[in-house]
UniProtKB/Swiss-Prot annotation:
Lineage: Eukaryota, Fungi, Dikarya, Ascomycota, Saccharomycotina
Gene Ontology cellular-component terms listed: cytoplasm; prefoldin complex
Name used for this protein in its record: Prefoldin subunit 2
Family: Belongs to the prefoldin subunit beta family.
Cross-referenced PANTHER family: PREFOLDIN SUBUNIT 2 (PTHR13303)
Pfam families reported for this sequence: Prefoldin_2 (PF01920)
Major subcellular location class: cytoplasm
Domain of life: Eukaryota
GO MF annotations, alphabetized: protein folding chaperone; tubulin binding; unfolded protein binding
Annotated localization: Cytoplasm
Species for this entry: Saccharomyces cerevisiae (strain ATCC 204508 / S288c) (Baker's yeast)
Protein's GO biological process: protein folding; tubulin complex assembly
Length: 111
């Protein structure tokens, strides 16, 4: 009986950790998307030939607005797509977790 409880506890903790990691990553990517939005808005008001710098693999690379803007917009779209997929995964995992709890008659007891 004790071993069975340990297995259930381990599985419960695993689900909770996965859900927490997904939520954290979604929030982090949301902040990245917001930063991209601010930079894109700022660059749209700038002259197309104006110099700007962007980080590529830890190095600052000089560019201009007209070159950097499409790259930033593409990255923002990719981030939005990733967030959407991660939200779907989060919802699916939460449903699996609830089903697992129901199937195994798991009740959370807090001290």
């Amino acid at each position: 009986m004790e071993q069975r409880n340990n297995v259930f506890q381990a599985k419960y903790n695993e689900y909770k950790q996965i859900l927490e990691e997904l939520q954290t990553k979604i929030i982090e990517l949301g902040h990245d998307k917001d930063e991209h939005t601010i930079v894109i808005k700022t660059l749209k008001d700038a002259e197309p030939t104006r110099k700007c710098y962007r980080m590529i693999g830890g190095a600052l690379v000089e560019s201009d607005v007209q070159t950097s803007l499409p790259i930033l917009e593409t990255k923002k779209e990719n981030i939005e797509g990733t967030i959407s997929k991660m939200k779907e995964t989060l919802i699916q995992t939460a449903k699996e977790f609830e089903k697992w709890k129901k199937d195994n008659k798991i009740q959370v007891v807090k001290n």
